[in-house]
Amino acid sequence: IGSGLVGSEMCIRDRCRKIERLRDCIKESNNNQTLYLEKDVSDIKTQRGDAADVIVSGKRSFEAAAPYASAGKKVCVLNFASATNPGGGVVNGSSAQEEALCRCSTLYFNLNIPCMMDKFYNPHRKMNNPLYNDDCLYTPKVIVFKKDVLFPELLPEKEWYPVDVLTCAAPNLRRYPNNFMNPNAGDKPAAIDEHQLTELLRSRIGKIFKVAANEGAEVLILGAFGCGAFCNPPQVVANVFKQVQQDYLHVFDTIEYAVFHTERETENYRVFKSVLG
């Protein structure tokens, strides 16, 4: 991680460089991560017997993943990503979902590498389109070594756990999409109506499920994808998740929507609980 880091991020950088186990895990994840471009991946599904448990919780993403991973399950966590900047605003102290994942794990060091800049981030920058596309990056065996809380706390090494992370960007519906966390996202709001947005999300969320299924995930940790900084309407997003997951209820053991919220900001959780709970 670069020079713009505040104290906690500097500690993460130093820890990942100095601890052999973390260095080795970063290298292994980099060697085995897969970029699924927009039209890649056929609909491969291994059917299981019972229907998946579908859960809506108020947890943070890694907080939700921890008990499954600790029990030996193959867990895939969706990263609500910046399409144009590795880790979003993590190096500047921002605190959305992607930044939280990067602060607690080795993920940033899998995203911020030359081949991913060339194949994932720079092509999105050249699009200059805040709707982005369906590209997904699947990173196996990311090591979570901090507790996923507002101020992440280092876990004892025996409690570190691996998760797979699926990186994908929701459409950026901000009035002014371009900022330091999302460079080259365009300076005008996306021209899209609710029907078009629904179709776009159906394609993108469908791709997320396909990739996770193709990679053999047993537990899928999702959430209010794009409903925070990217301003997607939670009712539309939750409805699309409900539609798409119907085809995957016998593919995963558990699908958990981890919709973290504060006491003041409960809309996303309330909507997801109403639609999917």
Please state what every model-predicted region is.
Residues 1-6, 11-12:
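Single conserved hydrophobic/aromatic residue that forms the stacking wall/gate
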Residues 19-34, 38, 191-192, 199-200, ...:
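Feature captures the RNA virus RNA-dependent RNA polymerase
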Residues 34-71:
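Active-site-flanking structural segment that lines cofactor/substrate pockets
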Residues 66-76, 80-215:
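Glycine-enriched loop-and-adjacent helix/strand subsegments that border the catalytic/binding cleft
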Residues 76, 218, 253:
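Short acidic/polar active-site loop segments enriched in Thr and Asp
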Residues 79, 219-224:
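Short glycine-rich phosphate-binding loop at a beta-alpha junction
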Residues 162, 168-171, 199, 203, ...:
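Divalent-metal-activated hydrolytic enzyme cores
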Residues 225-233:
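Glycine-rich phosphate-binding loops at beta-strand->alpha-helix junctions
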